[in-house]
């Protein structure tokens, strides 16, 4: 399964390490090592599931976007 990790803070970086080679891309508007700045820029055919590790205020829009596009979603708790 190809995984997109959204948010490269402490938890996001941990998730990248755990998912390893299954990570197809990362998204973070502030981390220069991320593959993309915005989730909208990631091709939908590039991943099957996403791990959302963002601040709480950003989660709802991201989760809605992923679900509308038929993606599996794992969300870090607040």
Predicted region positions:
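N-terminal Rossmann-like dinucleotide-binding module
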Residues: 1-36
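Beta-loop-alpha module in the N-terminal Rossmann-like domain of NAD(P)-dependent dehydrogenases
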Residues: 35-78
